[in-house]
């Protein structure tokens, strides 16, 4: 079954900010197309876009070419279509990354010129996973992550991608090579040299036992499909992730309590600190994720004096129904946490006023 079509992969111009061939120079000398600039007739690319003119020029022409392909394809079979983007990063000069591709600052041009493209999808190898997702979902745009890092942090990024940004799909690069029992691998000297020239984080392409963690993340998400779609996009669903090593935690305001989530120290060979929370009632929630210490607190300003955890359960979803495993008590309930291997817990609590 074909679900959607990738029209182009990381399209753009490498090595320079734009095409300087004779035909390209002639096109660049012409005014900006009226479709892009209805307010100032006859204005040049440089007058309108100044120093970013070369990249905007390339973005327009790449997007027009993609639109020709996509619109013709949809006439034959109207499937959803997407284009994925090689993202800009330091030193952030067009040509170091593919100039004119659908990076965030070019999307306004792409959306005008390539109306048949349904999704502009970021390939996220950068460490700022949250920032990229936020840019690509601006204005309610749908998110698809066709390529992501290969290291273990990708297994934790799954949860905020679905919980916060409602991604339609998530796949690390080369997922067909991932196995739960696959050993860690190192990059060759040639690979390291190429990544260095392209200013790409070497760790993003290092497989460090990711398979067993990612398999568990996918297993949890698959088992939670029913409850996920029930609460997707509502105030009862929350997500979180540690954005950098200086961030110690976060506090989420739930319906009946505040949830203090402290980020645990972890090695580079483990997933990061991230998770998803689904409130199935005012005094009950599920939390799935990794490397997080959990503390339930009274809601400030609510008049709550004390909060009691009634139960803390391990378990799993089977056919959409929660099947309780162990009921945790004693030290396990006192030290509430998610470990390095993705897991799910259910909490029931009672607030006293």
Q: PLM features: residue spans?
A:
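Polysaccharide-binding and catalytic clefts of secreted carbohydrate-active enzymes
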Residues: 1-107
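A generic short-segment signal for beta-strand/edge and adjacent turn/coil regions
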Residues: 50-52, 88-91, 113-114, 139-140, ...
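C-terminal beta-sandwich/jelly-roll accessory domains of carbohydrate-active enzymes
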Residues: 256-276, 282-353
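Short, solvent-exposed loop/turn segments at secondary-structure junctions
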Residues: 9-12, 87-90, 126-127, 150-151, ...
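Short, surface-exposed linear patches
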Residues: 26-30, 35-36, 142-143, 166-167, ...
């Amino acid at each position: 079954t074909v679900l959607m079509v990738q029209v182009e992969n990381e399209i753009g111009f490498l090595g320079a900010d734009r095409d300087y061939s004779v035909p390209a120079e002639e096109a660049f000398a012409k005014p900006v197309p009226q479709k892009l600039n209805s307010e100032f007739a006859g204005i040049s690319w440089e007058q309108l876009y100044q120093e970013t003119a070369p990249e905007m020029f390339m973005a327009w022409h790449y997007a027009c070419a993609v639109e020709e392909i996509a619109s013709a394809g949809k006439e034959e079979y109207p499937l959803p279509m997407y284009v994925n983007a090689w993202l800009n990063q330091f030193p952030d000069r067009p040509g170091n990354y593919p100039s004119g591709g659908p990076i965030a600052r070019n999307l306004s041009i792409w959306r005008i010129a390539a109306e048949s493209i349904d999704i502009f999808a970021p390939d996220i190898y950068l460490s700022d996973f949250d920032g990229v997702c936020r840019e690509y979902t601006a204005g309610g745009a749908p998110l698809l992550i066709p390529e992501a890092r290969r290291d273990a942090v990708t297994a934790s990024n799954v949860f905020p991608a679905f919980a916060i940004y409602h991604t339609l799909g998530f796949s690390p690069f080369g997922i067909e090579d991932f196995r739960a029992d696959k050993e860690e691998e190192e990059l060759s000297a040639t690979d390291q040299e190429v990544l260095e020239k392209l200013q790409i984080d070497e760790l993003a392409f290092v497989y460090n036992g990711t398979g067993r963690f990612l398999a568990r993340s996918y297993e949890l998400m698959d088992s939670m499909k029913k409850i996920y779609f029930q609460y997707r996009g509502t105030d009862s669903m929350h997500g979180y992730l540690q954005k950098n090593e200086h961030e110690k935690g976060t506090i989420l305001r739930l319906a009946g309590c505040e949830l203090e989530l402290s980020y645990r120290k972890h090695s580079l060979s483990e997933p990061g600190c991230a998770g998803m929370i689904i409130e199935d009632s005012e005094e009950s929630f599920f939390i799935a994720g990794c490397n997080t210490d959990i503390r339930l607190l009274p809601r400030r300003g609510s008049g709550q004096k004390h909060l009691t955890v009634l139960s803390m359960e391990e378990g799993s979803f089977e056919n959409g129904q929660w099947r309780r495993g162990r009921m945790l008590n004693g030290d396990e309930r006192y030290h509430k946490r998610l470990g390095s291997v993705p897991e799910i817990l259910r909490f029931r609590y009672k607030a006293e006023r």
